[in-house]
Design a protein with these regions (language model features):
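Non-catalytic N-terminal targeting/anchoring module and adjacent flexible stem/linker
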Residues: 1, 213-214, 230, 280-290
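Conserved alpha-helical substructure of the radical SAM core
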Residues: 1-106, 116-124, 288
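Residue-level marker of regulatory loop/turn positions in helix-turn-helix DNA-binding domains and
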Residues: 3-8, 208, 217, 270
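Processing junctions and N-termini across compartments
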Residues: 13, 17-20, 210, 272-275
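Local cysteine-cluster metal-coordination motifs and their immediate loop/turn environment
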Residues: 18-28, 233-236, 275-286
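Secreted/processed peptides and extracellular or luminal domains of membrane proteins
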Residues: 25, 29-32, 167, 222, ...
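Radical SAM enzyme [4Fe-4S]-AdoMet core and its adjacent flexible, acidic
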Residues: 36, 79-82, 97, 101-257, ...
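Cysteine/selenocysteine-centered motifs that mediate thiol-based redox chemistry or coordinate metal-sulfur cofactors
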Residues: 257-290
Length: 290
């Protein structure tokens, strides 16, 4: 089966829910599930390799906080899985690991490192990001670099973002704002990301019952596997409110064929949300307005 014909575009795999940060835009409780054992990660890779070409190491937590991250990356490479590494950029033990053969993209949330609640030296943080950019440039790496900042925080941090951008040729803050993205150098970009709110079971339906708005990529283009092995429809379900099953006890193919999973997918394909968490999620509205 060729990658283009695989069931999912990507599968989110949470290596841990530990990030050590307290970002104002992330209300989710963390440090509950802990680290996914390497043996379970190997099982995950074995079960998803026929379903997707890409695993995105993200739900909660920061994979770069793991001292043995290279072991997980080597396991992914053994199964020929491409890795999208999502990180805050705060916990980088060495740059060499970030250009591991298994990694095809590094996605960095600048909002995490620049959030005042985290009490991080912002200038030193941006300098570290710039140092990695230089390292990647010197290595002529084929890894994609996707730096992201939310549209609601760009102006607040422009005193840091403007000189960062001006470190690269033909790049400016004005150009970033106009285009919504800036090409820094080969396969390296800074993108403005639309601000969203994490879904909440108690939140009001942000779509106002507009059921025909295309809902979600969940179970259509993606699923997420939490660090304890629980499978959920998408990366927004950080607390497993819509648990589909546990990989420790049930094969993934059976979980995806379950009555619950099939019902959710069927409704999504019709532009409808079946679960309360999905009804209260604003992400579909952001996609609709693009």
């Amino acid at each position: 089966m060729t990658p283009s014909k695989k069931l999912f575009k990507k599968v989110y795999v949470e290596l841990s829910d530990i990030c050590g940060l307290q970002c104002s835009f992330c209300p989710n409780p963390k440090n509950i599930r802990g680290v996914m054992p390497l043996e379970l990660f190997e099982k995950v890779c074995k079960e998803v390799v026929s379903l997707t070409p890409i695993i995105t190491l993200h739900v909660l937590g920061d994979p770069c906080k793991l001292k043995n991250l290279d072991h997980y990356l080597s396991t992914a490479k053994r199964f020929s899985l491409k890795v999208d590494l999502v990180t805050s950029g705060v916990y980088w033990h060495n740059f060499e690991t970030l250009l591991h053969d298994a990694i095809y993209q590094i996605s960095i949330s600048l909002d995490a490192g620049l959030d005042n609640r985290n009490k991080i030296n912002q200038h030193r943080y941006i300098q570290k990001i710039l140092e990695f950019c230089r390292y990647k440039f010197e290595k002529n790496s084929e890894v994609f670099l996707n730096l992201r900042i939310q549209d609601s925080t760009l102006d607040k941090h422009q005193n840091l973002i403007k000189p960062f951008l001006e470190s690269f040729e033909f790049v400016s803050l004005e150009g970033l704002k106009t285009q919504g993205r800036a090409r820094l150098f080969k396969k390296s970009f800074l993108n403005i990301q639309k601000t969203f709110k994490w879904p909440n079971l108690n939140a009001q339906n942000p779509l106002n019952q507009k059921s025909k708005i295309p809902y979600c990529y969940g179970l259509i283009k993606q699923i997420a596997i939490l660090s304890n092995g629980v499978v959920v429809p998408c990366c927004m379900d950080t607390q497993a409110n819509i648990s589909l099953g546990d990989l420790n006890h049930t094969p993934l193919k059976d979980i995806l064929k379950s009555q619950k999973a099939m019902a959710i997918k069927t409704h999504f394909l019709k532009g409808e949300a079946l679960e309360l968490l999905c009804k209260n999620c604003s992400y579909p509205l952001i996609r609709y307005k693009k």
